[in-house]
Design a protein with these regions (language model features):
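Conserved helix-turn-beta segment of the N-terminal RecA-like "Helicase ATP-binding" lobe
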Residues: 168-193, 360-361
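Conserved segment of the helicase C-terminal RecA-like domain
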Residues: 431-465
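Walker A/P-loop
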Residues: 129-152
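Post-DEXD/H (motif II) to motif III coupling segment of the RecA-like Helicase ATP-binding lobe
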Residues: 225, 232-295, 471
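Conserved interdomain hinge at the start of the Helicase C-terminal
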Residues: 306-344, 348-359
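Conserved Walker A/P-loop ATP-binding site and its immediately adjacent core
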Residues: 144-180, 345-347
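Conserved helicase ATPase core of P-loop NTP-dependent helicases/translocases
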Residues: 172, 188-200, 351-352, 365-402
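A short beta-strand element within the Helicase C-terminal
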Residues: 223-224, 396, 405-418, 427, ...
Length: 487
C-alpha cells in the first residue's frame, strides 16, 4: 500500500490519506512564516504566531494547485503515492493530450484581429492543456489577449466563466479589449461593480472582487472556469474566500506581471490556481521590440542629516518638504511627453502636488488628479484624453494607476512617494512600457531621499535599496544622480 493516497475533495482541495507522522511532515513542509507578520495587529496581540499553514492536519486537506509540490515532497522523502479517482471530480492530475500547440495557434489566429505572439500561444497552450495555471507575464506582454483566448475556448464549450479583477477600471478595460479583438462582447459578457446588477444569465461575468466576495456559495455554483487578473492580489482573505467558494470550478487560471518574491506568496497563489509558468521577462520584450526601452534615473535628494524616531515621522517630513515638492513640480513641467506622477497619500501628498503643478502650468495643458474617489467613467475619460495629448500630466495614487491601466502614449513616470513593494514598483513601471505610434522609449524618475544620520540609514533610503535590487534582477538600466537639497 502507498504511503500517501491522494484524491480530490472538490476543485479547491485535495485530500491526503496517510499516517499521522506523514501528516506532521507535510505540515512542516507547507508551513511558512509570513514576512510582514510582525507588523500585523493579530501578531502583536499574540493571537497568531505569524505562520501560514497550507496543509490541514485535522482533515488532511491541501489546495489542489499544490499537487506538484506534494509529489516532490514524496520523492524527497522516498514515500510512495497513488492517485485515487473521485466519482464526481475525477483524478487529481489530468492532462488534455488532445490539445496541441499547432491547434491552439490556429485557433488564436482565427478568433482575433491581432496576430498572437509565440510566447502568448505557448502560455495559452500550457494553460488549456493542464486546466489550471498561474501565468506570470509582465505588463505590455498581452495578457488580455491570452485571457480572451482562454475565455473564447470555454465559451465554445458552453462553460460559465468568472473573471475577477481588482478595480472597476480594469472591468471596463477588459470588456473593451475583448470588443477590440473582434468579439460580440455584449452578447456574452456582463460587467459587475458598484451599482451594477449581480444576477445575470450571461455566460461570462467580469467583476471586481469587492462586488462578489460577500455573496453566498450558491452564487458561485454555476461557474466551471475562474480567471484571476492581477492574481498577485489573491493572497488577501476576501479573494481566498472567493476561490474557496468555487468548489466546482475545474478550470483555474491566474495572470500576474510579478510576484512578491516570497515563497509563501507564490505557494498560496499556486494552491489557488495551479503551478506557475513564467511566460516571458520584461527585458526580453524590450529586446524583441514589443515594449518601449526603459531608462531609469534615480534622483537621490541629499537632505541635511536628520534622525527620525519612526517611519511615519520620516514620511511626514518627506511629503511636507516644500523644496522636494517644488523639485517634483519643476521636473514634471520640464519633461517632454505625457507624464504620470505616482503618490501614496491623497490628502497629505497627492492633493498638494496636484495644486502646485496645476497652478504653475501653462493654459491649455491638461493636468489631471486621480485617486480612489474619482469615478470609473472619469478615469477612463482621462485615459482616453491622454492618449491623444502630447504633454498631459496625471497626478495619481498608486492604488488607482499602478496596476493594469493601459496608456500607450505615456512617456514618463515619476515615483513621488517611497515604496519598497516589489509588486507595486514593477507594476508601476509597466504603466510606461507600452509602445505608441510615435513612442519607442520611456523614462522612470525614481525620487529618493538620503537623510542618513551618522552611520544610520534612513527608512526610505532602505526602500530605495530594495528597488535597486529589483532593477538589477530585471536587468534594467539605471543611473543614480545625487542632488543636494537644503532644509
Amino acid at each position: 500500500m502507498s504511503n500517501l493516497i491522494i484524491s480530490k475533495k472538490n476543485e479547491v482541495y485535495l485530500h491526503v490519506d496517510a499516517e499521522p507522522h506523514v501528516y506532521y511532515e507535510l505540515a512542516d513542509q507547507f508551513t511558512f512564516e509570513l514576512p510582514d507578520a510582525k507588523f500585523m495587529p493579530q501578531y502583536k496581540s499574540k493571537y497568531w504566531d505569524g505562520k501560514i499553514r497550507l496543509f490541514n492536519t485535522q482533515n488532511g486537506n491541501i489546495y489542489v494547485g499544490l499537487l506538484d509540490r506534494i509529489v516532490q515532497f514524496c520523492k524527497d522523502h522516498e514515500y510512495t503515492y497513488e492517485f485515487q479517482e473521485s466519482e464526481y471530480y475525477g483524478l487529481p492530475f489530468e492532462v488534455n493530450d488532445f490539445i496541441s500547440k499547432e491547434g491552439v495557434k490556429d485557433y488564436m489566429f482565427s478568433i482575433c484581429k491581432h496576430s498572437p505572439r509565440e510566447y502568448q500561444i505557448e502560455g495559452v497552450y500550457d494553460a488549456l492543456r493542464h486546466n489550471r495555471k498561474l501565468l506570470i507575464s509582465p505588463t505590455a506582454s498581452g495578457k488580455s489577449l491570452m485571457i480572451y483566448s482562454i475565455v473564447r475556448y470555454y465559451v465554445g464549450r458552453k462553460q460559465s466563466i468568472l473573471i475577477v479583477v481588482p478595480t472597476t477600471s480594469l472591468v471596463e478595460q477588459m470588456y473593451k479589449d475583448f470588443a477590440d479583438y473582434g468579439w460580440d462582447v455584449g452578447s456574452y459578457c456582463h460587467k459587475i461593480y458598484a451599482g451594477k446588477e449581480r444576477e445575470t444569465d450571461s455566460q461570462v461575468i467580469i467583476t471586481t472582487w469587492q462586488s462578489i466576495y460577500k455573496l453566498p456559495r450558491k452564487y458561485f455554483d454555476r461557474f466551471s472556469v475562474v480567471i484571476g487578473d492581477e492574481a498577485h492580489q489573491f493572497k488577501s482573505k476576501s479573494l481566498v474566500s472567493i476561490m474557496g467558494k468555487l468548489g466546482d470550478a475545474k478550470y483555474r487560471f491566474g495572470f500576474t506581471g510579478t510576484l512578491s518574491g516570497s515563497q509563501t506568496h507564490k505557494w498560496v497563489l499556486e494552491g489557488l490556481f495551479g503551478p506557475s509558468y513564467k511566460i516571458i521577462k520584461t527585458n526580453e520584450l524590450m529586446k524583441k521590440g514589443h515594449v518601449a526601452s526603459l531608462d531609469i534615473n534615480v534622483l537621490l535628494l541629499k537632505h541635511p542629516p536628520t534622525r527620525f524616531e519612526t517611519f511615519e515621522d520620516e514620511v511626514q517630513y518627506i511629503i511636507g518638504h516644500n523644496q522636494r515638492n517644488n523639485f517634483i513640480k519643476n521636473l514634471a513641467l520640464d519633461l517632454k511627453g505625457n507624464t504620470l506622477i505616482l503618490f501614496a497619500r491623497v490628502e497629505g501628498h497627492g492633493e498638494p502636488l496636484y495644486n502646485l503643478i496645476n497652478s504653475n502650468t501653462v493654459i491649455n495643458r491638461h493636468v489631471f488628479f486621480v485617486h480612489g474617489g474619482v469615478a470609473t467613467e472619469d478615469r477612463e475619460q482621462i485615459r482616453e484624453i491622454t492618449e491623444s495629448e502630447s504633454d498631459a500630466i496625471i497626478v495619481a495614487s498608486y492604488g488607482t494607476f499602478s496596476t493594469g491601466i493601459n496608456i500607450k502614449n505615456l512617456h514618463n513616470v515619476i515615483f513621488a512617494s517611497p515604496s519598497k513593494s516589489r509588486i507595486r514598483n514593477l507594476q508601476s513601471i509597466g504603466r510606461v512600457l507600452r509602445k505608441g505610434s510615435n513612442k519607442t522609449k520611456a523614462t522612470l524618475y525614481d525620487i529618493a531621499d538620503d537623510i542618513s544620520y551618522k552611520s544610520r540609514r534612513n527608512y526610505t533610503l532602505n526602500h530605495l535599496i530594495e528597488r535597486i535590487k529589483v532593477y538589477n534582477e530585471e536587468n534594467f538600466n539605471y543611473d543614480i544622480v545625487n542632488i543636494p537639497l537644503k532644509k
